[in-house]
Amino acid sequence: MSAETGLGTRLRATSVMGDGVEGAQMSGQQQPAQPQPQTPMMQTPPPEIARPNQPKRQTNQLQYLLKTVLKTLWKHQFAWPFQVPVDVVKLNLPDYYKIIKTPMDMGTIKKRLENHFYWNAQECIQDFNTMFTNCYIYNKPGDDIVLMAEALEKLFLQKISEMPQEETELAVVQCKGRGRARKEQDASITPMRTRVLSGSLGDKSAVKPPVTPVSKPATPTPPAVIRAPTPPQTKPQQAHPPAITQAPISFSPIISQDVVVPTTVVPTPVPQPLANHPAVIHTAAQPAKTKKGVKRKADTTTPTTHDPLHESSPLPSDPKPPKAGPRKESGRQIRPIKKTEVPDSQLPAPPDLHPQPAPIAEKDSKTSEQLRYCAGIVREMFSKKHQAYAWPFYKPVDVETLGLHDYCEIIKHPMDLGTIKVKMENCDYKNAQDFASDVRLMFSNCYKYNPPDHEVVIMARKLQDVFEMRFAKMPDEPEEAPAPVPSPAPGPPAPSIKIPPPTSSDTSSDSSSDSESSSDSEEERAQRLAELQEQLKAVHEQLAALSQPQPNKPKKKEREKRKEKHKRKEEVEETRKGRIREPPAKKPKKSVQVSGGTPSIKKEAPPPVTRPARPAPPPAPCESSEEDTQRCRPMSYEEKRQLSLDINKLPGEKLGRVVHIIQSREPSLKNSNPDEIEIDFETLKPSTLRELERYVTSCLRKKRKPQDKIEAPTSGIVKVKSYSSSESESSSESSTSDSEESDPETAPNQKKKGHSGRESRKHHHPMQQPLIAPPPVMKPPSPTLAPSYPPPSSLDSSHPSLHHPLHPANVFEAVMQLPPDLPPHLAGQTEHCSPPHLNQHALTSPPALHNAMPQQPSRPSNRAAALPTKPARPPSASPPLPPPQPHHQPPAHVHHHHHHHHHAQPPHVLLEDDGPPSPHTGLPSYLQQLHKSQQPPTQSPIHSLLTTVKVQSQAPMAAPAQSMRHHQPLVYPPPSSSASPAPSPASSHIHQMQSPPVVPQQQPAGQAPPPPQQQQQQQQQQQHPALQGTLVSSHQHHVQHQQAKQQQVIQHHHHHHPSPRQQKQETYPGGHLREAPSPLLLHSPQVPPYPGLTHPPSPQSVQPKKQEMRGALVLQPQPLVMKEDKRHSPSVRPEGFSPGMRPEPPKVPEVLKGPSHIQPRPDLKPMDGGRPVRPPDQSLPPQGMPEKEKQKQEPKTPVAPKKDLKIKNMGSWAGLMQKPPVTPTSAGKSTSDSFELFRRQAREKEERERALKHQAEQAERMRREQERMRTREDDDVQDQTRKAHEEARRRQEQQQQQQQQHVQSNLPAAPSPAQSSQPIMDQREMARKREQERRRRQAMAPSIDMNFQSELMEIFEQNLFS
């Protein structure tokens, strides 16, 4: 009965809260039953909470029910009525036990769980269901208590759904603890509380909650009452009362303090459970209790933050918390174990990472610094900053407290941060790697024992990330590790950094597949594997680092020799030489790395293999120390900013190397996606930043180096020879190119010999072509012909071979200026067809800028310079290529024209150098034609030339070119014999020497604009042979406006790139040199061609032309391709010389329709020397054109705004022209005239286009006007019919009205006219509205002409930009 009274008193305290709900709900039912004596008899004893005779059993599901389900329900705001048994006396519920046969409450369930009353989870769940069912049975459905029970039940079911599916039995640990703790009423609960709280590290905060709740009112009395009855009471009753007072306490970290009402009693028991709890584990742990208390205070924050972790995962949270309890004891035990076993776990590391135990004294200083750094890492992991996720690792796992009996079987080498810290303080670690292996062992244990999705695993990953980040930033000094692989300091630290992530991943993978028996060996294997990987990465990095300073090999040999002779002097000399030689080392680096886009990496890999110079590290200390300081020197903000800008300048293929550098040196970014990496310079190590800086500057230096080289050749051949090997190669190549022309038969062989030279030169300039021709860069064919031919210096100095259009130096310069962004569709077209004699200088040389020339606007000539060559289609295969494009075939003379200008177009001429040249490769075009007369046509390379021409001379130059179309063949009659190839180079040199001095060296750049123009002219001539005729006189004055500029451009072009044809003709008549005017000049209507050049072609030359006509399939496709480009690649169009001009698409189809133009060959007629040839009338459409288009072409309405667009660089060109020309005045005149002609033609084309457009617009307007007229006529017809109907109806109405008037004679006369006039007025109004609407439509229709609007806008924009 005392128990009952105790219960009653206890329940009174809580019933004060419950009266409001339960009392109110049940008072109506219970009022009649008032007899008090009956109440105590009805008050049945509380349910049994222990089974002393039955063995206790604990399962994971029961543990979950206690620590997660019950804990969550207990905290719910509606839980208070269910926390204690129903007090029928207090609530006056005499019939309660009649209706409810098995009362149940959460307090009882809690006691039963704590006392291991349940055999399995199902029994406990049954008790919960009983409690809810009792509430629903006894109370009315709408009562508040029922609603509260429903809310609790919903939460209960939700938590049950998350319960582990399989029930596994756990060892029962706490019997003894409870027995000892009976001295205090709360003892039975305290062990549980300490276990739970230690699991969450809440035990530390357990001391605090009791202190705060003391302020809670009125609850101290219940504890007093509880204490009085407790001695006589049985176990169950003892356990029961504390449940009420202390249940809140056990969850104190989570429950608000007002719920922890009766905790005044708690402070005293807390130490006791802790005391006996260690006693159970190890009696020696008593002294550590005080320290535990201290630590608790430090950890008060963690329980609250990680509350949910413990709720959701009671077991997992426990493994870490126990560390809080017996930290030092278990630490002491584990430490001896670890001492015996650590060497095993670390065996792989010492041999790998410390193979040289001899110089320990030196290492000690360095490792001491590293170990100090490691001690700082440990301190940081113990700091509050990381406490939220580091706390489970502070102390060893308390196996007994947590009931983890299989822990020692699975984890053979336990480890925790406390043990690591003690070992660090005791100097047990010899180096940083030992320390790192222990830390990683701790994490791997965690991953192995816990499931991958466990909270503790997540916390371990976070903490490991922190550790790896800090460890990666360990100072680079302890680079003793590099000893196995010498020299590069940055190598070793990175590998050590890299290991951690793999170990964590390896261990986490182990965790999923761990076996009790072989776990130890697996762990050791994983560690060994990780360390081997680390070493391998270190070796790779060092190889990469060593591969860059390749030229150190000779240095090392010299050092060894010096060592033998002068050991002391050697160091000084080495330091001196190291500084001196580092720049050369870098140069080779460049050649290695830069060697063509992607190949750069391949080039780097081989050097390490060949690098046998490991013995050299001994002398290198001075240099390496300096290099180390340089590498590790921190970067300023400005340097970082500059570095980021430089990285952004790099082409795509170089960025891959940047990512590799970062990932190899930054472990945190090692596993990041290489395609997309975010770089934060603040987090990168100084050594990484320095390495990036070194690489980026080397790349950019190579990028700029080509321009320097471009200037170098301008000073002369001798200078080129003397300065750099690459330039000497280019100069030798120039000689070979010249000799190639003289001796075409030997060219193929020498090509093959010269592969390496060309390749090396290609590799020097990959940066300029990263996107353009990476595959060709790797191609071997395209040799420098240096070996067999005399160097250019052997030629007379007065013949600057560098100016030769085929000269390799020009090619070289062009290569250096290749734009990286050449459109691929242009690139692809030129690949398969470049003339072999040009191919020998494979990478076309884009024009180099001359100092004296103004800066050139972007134009196709610059773009077309570096057309990429497809490796799949080498020139050797090019001859068969032409057939696929037969429909493009222009007249046979096309080949002829193009040949004239092949050599005048450096950017295109030198496009591709793959494959041996055809037998007559080096010969000028007319000689090649003679060869062709005896050979089947295989001139596909020339096709490529034309393709390149197409690229450069796209749309903008189309118009002027057309006017020039039909005169090229007349200008250059083929020579009578195929002999005399040799004088060509000399003649070209002399010719260039005679040209104005300002221009010579800058051939590459200066010509940029003219070549495209000439080529297009040629192509258009070939495409429109039927258009030959006289130029419309109305256009002559337009052309004259541009004479000065054209004159300059063509003269410049003429000086720099006399075409091979011109060169040959210079020597043609009698072998004496002769000034050959530019092809444009010869076609100029105002300047008569030279008499010697205009005499009719010899029959020999004519016949080759005819045969060429049959055989030039290769060339024939070209013009069409160009035309198509003009139509389809507008992106290139604006870059033309005259941006305002646009191609005229209507002409293309008709021109290309058929080979009808091929037969007439009107352009082969001999020319009179004195009579200027007038260019064909541009306005005349091709023969195939429909009449409509002919009419459109006839009117030429010049548009003023576009005239000025051509004269952008007038001043600069004029400046070039004003220089005193060395050539005879006739040549100057001819060039000026040809330029004038060119300008005139360009203007005419522009005007013709405008006229065509204007005509089209007029035709459109006429069509619209006709439509309007038609609609108007239709409206008129409709109106007439309508009017006829209306008149008929009106007459009928009038007749009816008259009849009515007669019938209704009594009505006044006035209304009748009004009635008859009314419909007439309506009709008139309708007609008036219709007419207004029609006129409005008519007025509005012509007001908006979109074509006219766009034309106006275009004119405005052109004026704006001109």
From Swiss-Prot:
CDD domains: Bromo_Brdt_I_like (cd05497), Bromo_Brdt_II_like (cd05498). It is found in: Nucleus; Chromosome. Residues 57-163, 365-474 form the Bromo domain. GO terms for cellular component: chromatin; nucleus. The keyword Methyltransferase does not apply. PROSITE patterns: BROMODOMAIN_1 (PS00633), BROMODOMAIN_2 (PS50014), NET (PS51525). Pfam families: BET (PF17035), BRD4_CDT (PF17105), Bromodomain (PF00439). Keywords: Bromodomain, Chromatin regulator, Chromosome, Nucleus, Repeat, Transcription, Transcription regulation. Residues 926-941, 1224-1234 have a biased composition (Polar residues). Residues 34-49, 219-234, 348-358, 481-503, 606-621, 772-793, 871-889, 1086-1099 have a biased composition (Pro residues). GO terms for molecular function: lysine-acetylated histone binding; p53 binding; transcription cis-regulatory region binding. Residues 542-597 are annotated as: BID region. It comes from the Eukaryota. Its main location: nucleus. Residues 22-57, 200-243, 274-367, 476-639, 699-941, 953-1349 are annotated as: Disordered. Residues 623-707 form the NET domain. InterPro entries: BRD4_CDT, Bromo_Brdt_I, Bromo_Brdt_II, Bromo_chromatin_reader, Bromodomain, Bromodomain-like_sf, Bromodomain_CS, NET_dom. Residues 503-521 are annotated as: NPS region. Residues 504-516, 722-737, 953-963, 977-1006, 1014-1028, 1041-1050, 1308-1319 have a biased composition (Low complexity). The keyword Transcription regulation applies. Residues 553-568, 750-766, 893-905 have a biased composition (Basic residues). GO terms for biological process: chromatin remodeling; positive regulation of canonical NF-kappaB signal transduction; positive regulation of T-helper 17 cell lineage commitment; positive regulation of transcription by RNA polymerase II; positive regulation of transcription elongation by RNA polymerase II; regulation of DNA-templated transcription; regulation of inflammatory response. Chromatin reader protein that recognizes and binds acetylated histones and plays a key role in transmission of epigenetic memory across cell divisions and transcription regulation. Remains associated with acetylated chromatin throughout the entire cell cycle and provides epigenetic memory for postmitotic G1 gene transcription by preserving acetylated chromatin status and maintaining high-order chromatin structure. During interphase, plays a key role in regulating the transcription of signal-inducible genes by associating with the P-TEFb complex and recruiting it to promoters. The 2 bromo domains mediate specific binding to acetylated histones. The exact combination of modified histone tails required to recruit brd4 to target genes is still unclear. The first bromo domain has high affinity for acetylated histone H4 tail, whereas the second bromo domain recognizes multiply acetylated marks in histone H3. Belongs to the BET family. This is Bromodomain-containing protein 4B. It comes from Xenopus laevis (African clawed frog).
